[in-house]
Amino acid sequence: MTNLQDQTQQIVPFIRSLLMPTTGPASIPDDTLEKHTLRSETSTYNLTVGDTGSGLIVFFPGFPGSIVGAHYTLQSNGNYKFDQMLLTAQNLPASYNYCRLVSRSLTVRSSTLPGGVYALNGTINAVTFQGSLSELTDVSYNGLMSATANINDKIGNVLVGEGVTVLSLPTSYDLGYVRLGDPIPAIGLDPKMVATCDSSDRPRVYTITAADDYQFSSQYQPGGVTITLFSANIDAITSLSIGGELVFQTSVQGLVLGATIYLIGFDGTAVITRAVAADNGLTAGTDNLMPFNLVIPTNEITQPITSIKLEIVTSKSGGQAGDQMSWSASGSLAVTIHGGNYPGALRPVTLVAYERVATGSVVTVAGVSNFELIPNPELAKNLVTEYGRFDPGAMNYTKLILSERDRLGIKTVWPTREYTDFREYFMEVADLNSPLKIAGAFGFKDIIRAIRRIAVPVVSTLFPPAAPLAHAIGEGVDYLLGDEAQAASGTARAASGKARAASGRIRQLTLAADKGYEVVANLFQVPQNPVVDGILASPGVLRGAHNLDCVLREGATLFPVVITTVEDAMTPKALNSKMFAVIEGVREDLQPPSQRGSFIRTLSGHRVYGYAPDGVLPLETGRDYTVVPIDDVWDDSIMLSKDPIPPIVGNSGNLAIAYMDVFRPKVPIHVAMTGAPNACGEIEKISFRSTKLATAHRLGLKLAGPGAFDVNTGPNWATFIKRFPHNPRDWDRLPYLNLPYLPPNAGRQYHLAMAASEFKDTPELESAVRAMEAAANVDSLFQSALSVFMWLEENGIVTDMANFTLSDPNAHRMRNFLANAPQAGSKSQRAKYGTAGYGVEARGPTPEEAQRKKDTRISKKMETMGIYFATPEWVALNGHRGPSPGQLKYWQNTREIPDPNEDYLDYVHAEKSRLASDEQILRAATSIYGAPGQAEPPQAFIDEVAKVYEINHGRGPNQEQMKDLLLTAMEMKHRNPRRAPPKPKPKPNAPTQRPPGRLGRWIRTVSDEDLE
């Protein structure tokens, strides 16, 4: 398969490009091996809305070339008018000879408003029609929705601000390269001559019987009589040719005919006009043959063609009014659309209609088209091309997925936000190793897993790290696991019932896990077992490609089991971990067939189904239980597995059964593990703990149990039972168990995660952890702090958080972050990530809770205003309202807590007089009378200001009173005897005095005094 080097992802690039074209092009993995280059071409258009606010965008989502679609605006007469063609940014025929379309997506939306418009109005209808454009019978805004009955091919009433996305899905996989109509070297008399090489592959041919002994009769008219001989629907956006012949017969002498062919566009206008006969004279009494052959190149087709029409003009040489003109015609013609039957060339079409958009608004069309292109000889000199890779697994997987696209929710037209939300789901579909959690939430998981089992190599998909092993064995997963599978710390049994709990010494163990997981050097040492090299391990879960059952809201306790395969001395082994669930009751219907019918009795006589019948289970239970293998846990639901797992035994299972019997959890979040294997040999270190931890972590679960319980069982399993009592009544005497005894109605239980730690286990650290656990059981605040620490340590962000505390010593940033952090399932999170991935939506508060929150909110607001008597209890007694004006006045005047529901109206209407001081009145009078430095206000003005203060009960003047005081001040200033005399105003019209004697400016005049 593709990308086998990546052990965590196994992407099929072709289907990823089909479902998400913006991720780029990918070679089609079929057997058409041509050297090509991959190219992604964008298309971006800003279309102006017409006067009616309505329009239509026609897309050809599967057309292999530069043509993307066309835009039409709706006129006031109800007809569409062609606006422009929509093409890719680059003219592909200018540089490339051949093309194959890989994928295409286009988005239509509007986010701009013309001047004077303040609201973004308008809606969009979109439909993918599995036919040609000419076959549409109703192209109105509402009529488009009747073009198809498939709900996945149409959407209606999408706001133009949100927009729609058109996704091109292939209609066929037998695709060859198409000639693009590229120019070819040619020399002619006309320097503007153009010669192109068009596609001849899969032409579409329309055969039309133009006339079959058609009889025409009319009287002479000046200019001739025009008649439409035929009109037929055709579809063309590329070059076409028209060939045929007509035969005319007449008995009238001097009859002249002219014939014209019209190619008509979608809007009803003639796009191309060609005369096939002009003033051809007909000979009476004989067959007059009129052959014609037309070729229309692609560059002359400026808009989509949807029909063809042939008109005949009849006239008579030297005719007089009333002369008879009659003739008969027969013949046929053929219209050949070059490449018209290529898959996706003319059908299907996607139509996007918008309505009630503001005139002058801009509708944006943006998208991407991915191609396989073969360059022309000139470009090939500088462009490296490569062969495509034939991958039948990827091709079959793509075909099977798209064949079930209606069941998998894969549409051709989407609301843009919904398409964005589905991108993570599409990534799961394209990744063969994805756990399909989002697909499981939508209910598509069973279908996709069944398709994976059919389409791709089973072992490579289900157990990626074992892909080389699977290729070496050459067998399926059923044989790989088989009945000879065995488990440590939960041992699977063979069909014969013999225990296969022991294996040979492991010399080399390759563990596919993160750092911090322990590797077992010598797992078991028992005689009569061969030495095995090259054990391959993985922390994942062995998965079978089977349909899953889902048990919703089932209370359960989960526990991991380590499984190893045993074939023979020459076959490599595989080590993996599987998760099991303990469910209350007899539920053999949930078990795989390999586990049914096997049970073990407990000390109290009850049965545990799914266990190997090996003696008596050393537990006292109050009811029957069933052990089932699971594949996933999602939204508090258990995804059951149908893998052929034999019955099991083991300490972790015993602990899980005892835990289930005591606590009976309501949701499956508990994972029990002892950390000790069920083996008949000595163990050097904690065996299989890391593999179990990885399995629990992959499901996002915590482990509850001693984890690193240090035991030395020796060869006797009963010795371990004595040292580790499984009787639930003895659990309160086991200080090393992280299983707090809580009542059944306590809801979700919290357990310290026994996960792989970044800290190295030491005796001192273990003592400190036990001390903290003991303190947590006593102090709830310390338990909360410890849970935060364990959360930081489990997710590996202890160091990051320590660095963050240095930059935020007072926790201001952290407090603001927590206060403003959006919650899962909130409106902002759904808008960003969609509804996929979230479990149960957050429950809204009850009316009582909402009322209490409101009371608390009002109380806090009053407290910020200095009103401390309005406690939440007082607000609740006051009718869930804050203090009234009367209550506030009462509290301000008396400093006593007002009675709830008492309005104290006397304190509202009876104003308490507050006298202003003489200094305050003098300061106000001085300020009103004049600026500082002027004369002091007279006593009469001060008395006027004092009257205003008295009227206002100690408050200053309002605006009207201020105007009156200013006028009074002006009058008093004019009649004040102490005010300065006014300066005389110069007369503006007084003539200036001229110097006597007309002397110069610098000559001094001589007076009589000077002469004396």
UniProtKB/Swiss-Prot annotation:
<keyword id="KW-1035">Host cytoplasm</keyword>
<feature type="region of interest" description="Disordered">
    <location>
        <begin position="968"/>
        <end position="1012"/>
    </location>
</feature>
<dbReference type="InterPro" id="IPR043049">
    <property type="entry name" value="Birna_VP3_dom2"/>
</dbReference>
<dbReference type="GO" id="GO:0006508">
    <property type="term" value="P:proteolysis"/>
</dbReference>
<comment type="function">
    <text>Capsid protein VP2 self assembles to form an icosahedral capsid with a T=13 symmetry, about 70 nm in diameter, and consisting of 260 VP2 trimers. The capsid encapsulates the genomic dsRNA. VP2 is also involved in attachment and entry into the host cell by interacting with host ITGA4/ITGB1.</text>
</comment>
<dbReference type="InterPro" id="IPR029053">
    <property type="entry name" value="Viral_coat"/>
</dbReference>
<feature type="site" description="Cleavage; by protease VP4">
    <location>
        <begin position="501"/>
        <end position="502"/>
    </location>
</feature>
<keyword id="KW-0479">Metal-binding</keyword>
<feature type="region of interest" description="Interaction with VP1 protein">
    <location>
        <begin position="1003"/>
        <end position="1012"/>
    </location>
</feature>
<dbReference type="Pfam" id="PF01767">
    <property type="entry name" value="Birna_VP3"/>
</dbReference>
<keyword id="KW-0167">Capsid protein</keyword>
<dbReference type="GO" id="GO:0008236">
    <property type="term" value="F:serine-type peptidase activity"/>
</dbReference>
<dbReference type="GO" id="GO:0039621">
    <property type="term" value="C:T=13 icosahedral viral capsid"/>
</dbReference>
<keyword id="KW-0720">Serine protease</keyword>
<feature type="domain" description="Peptidase S50">
    <location>
        <begin position="513"/>
        <end position="755"/>
    </location>
</feature>
<feature type="site" description="Cleavage; by protease VP4">
    <location>
        <begin position="441"/>
        <end position="442"/>
    </location>
</feature>
<feature type="site" description="Cleavage; by protease VP4">
    <location>
        <begin position="512"/>
        <end position="513"/>
    </location>
</feature>
<dbReference type="GO" id="GO:0030430">
    <property type="term" value="C:host cell cytoplasm"/>
</dbReference>
<feature type="compositionally biased region" description="Basic residues">
    <location>
        <begin position="975"/>
        <end position="986"/>
    </location>
</feature>
<keyword id="KW-0378">Hydrolase</keyword>
<feature type="active site">
    <location>
        <position position="692"/>
    </location>
</feature>
<dbReference type="Pfam" id="PF01766">
    <property type="entry name" value="Birna_VP2"/>
</dbReference>
<comment type="function">
    <text>The precursor of VP2 plays an important role in capsid assembly. First, pre-VP2 and VP2 oligomers assemble to form a procapsid. Then, the pre-VP2 intermediates may be processed into VP2 proteins by proteolytic cleavage mediated by VP4 to obtain the mature virion. The final capsid is composed of pentamers and hexamers but VP2 has a natural tendency to assemble into all-pentameric structures. Therefore pre-VP2 may be required to allow formation of the hexameric structures.</text>
</comment>
<keyword id="KW-0946">Virion</keyword>
<dbReference type="InterPro" id="IPR025775">
    <property type="entry name" value="Birna_VP4_Prtase_dom"/>
</dbReference>
<feature type="site" description="Cleavage; by protease VP4">
    <location>
        <begin position="755"/>
        <end position="756"/>
    </location>
</feature>
<dbReference type="InterPro" id="IPR002662">
    <property type="entry name" value="Birna_VP2"/>
</dbReference>
<dbReference type="GO" id="GO:0046872">
    <property type="term" value="F:metal ion binding"/>
</dbReference>
<dbReference type="GO" id="GO:0005198">
    <property type="term" value="F:structural molecule activity"/>
</dbReference>
<feature type="site" description="Cleavage; by protease VP4">
    <location>
        <begin position="494"/>
        <end position="495"/>
    </location>
</feature>
<feature type="binding site">
    <location>
        <position position="30"/>
    </location>
    <ligand>
        <name>a divalent metal cation</name>
    </ligand>
</feature>
<keyword id="KW-0645">Protease</keyword>
<feature type="region of interest" description="Disordered">
    <location>
        <begin position="837"/>
        <end position="857"/>
    </location>
</feature>
<dbReference type="InterPro" id="IPR002663">
    <property type="entry name" value="Birna_VP3"/>
</dbReference>
<dbReference type="InterPro" id="IPR043048">
    <property type="entry name" value="Birna_VP3_dom1"/>
</dbReference>
<feature type="active site" description="Nucleophile">
    <location>
        <position position="652"/>
    </location>
</feature>
<feature type="site" description="Cleavage; by protease VP4">
    <location>
        <begin position="487"/>
        <end position="488"/>
    </location>
</feature>
<dbReference type="Pfam" id="PF01768">
    <property type="entry name" value="Birna_VP4"/>
</dbReference>
<protein>
    <recommendedName>
        <fullName>Structural polyprotein</fullName>
        <ecNumber>3.4.21.-</ecNumber>
    </recommendedName>
</protein>
<keyword id="KW-1146">T=13 icosahedral capsid protein</keyword>
